[in-house]
Amino acid sequence: MSGRFAFNKGLKEVRFLFCQTGEHSAATRSFLLRNYPAMKKDNPATPILIRDASGTLPKVYARFEFGKEKSQSLEGLSDQQIEETVSSLVKNNS
């Protein structure tokens, strides 16, 4: 499990947006409950922001050096698909 979420060195911040009660965000909430401790342990210096607001569609943002930002919708994805999406997003800054 260690290193599964080893972030790219150019990554400055990861942000998760989702609804705290909506069914469309259930997989995102489950993913974060299960994986946040491992992500933070593997990347203690990188801020991982969790923003929940009523009615918000699930999405993840990755901010890289020089202000470059990428985002990916997590709507309709399973817990496993979210893990793959986040892993891919935080390892690529191209």
From Swiss-Prot:
Pfam families: L51_S25_CI-B8 (PF05047). It is a peripheral membrane protein. Its main location: mitochondrion. One of its GO terms (cellular component) is respiratory chain complex I. The keyword Iron does not apply. InterPro entries: NADH_Ub_cplx-1_asu_su-2, Ribosomal_mL43/mS25/NADH_DH, Thioredoxin-like_sf. Keywords: Electron transport, Membrane, Mitochondrion, Mitochondrion inner membrane, Respiratory chain, Transport. It is found in: Mitochondrion inner membrane. SMART domains: L51_S25_CI-B8 (SM00916). PANTHER family: NADH DEHYDROGENASE [UBIQUINONE] 1 ALPHA SUBCOMPLEX SUBUNIT 2 (PTHR12878:SF0), NADH-UBIQUINONE OXIDOREDUCTASE B8 SUBUNIT (PTHR12878). Belongs to the complex I NDUFA2 subunit family. Complex I is composed of about 40 different subunits. Accessory subunit of the mitochondrial membrane respiratory chain NADH dehydrogenase (Complex I), that is believed not to be involved in catalysis. Complex I functions in the transfer of electrons from NADH to the respiratory chain. The immediate electron acceptor for the enzyme is believed to be ubiquinone. This is NADH-ubiquinone oxidoreductase 10.5 kDa subunit. It comes from Neurospora crassa (strain ATCC 24698 / 74-OR23-1A / CBS 708.71 / DSM 1257 / FGSC 987).
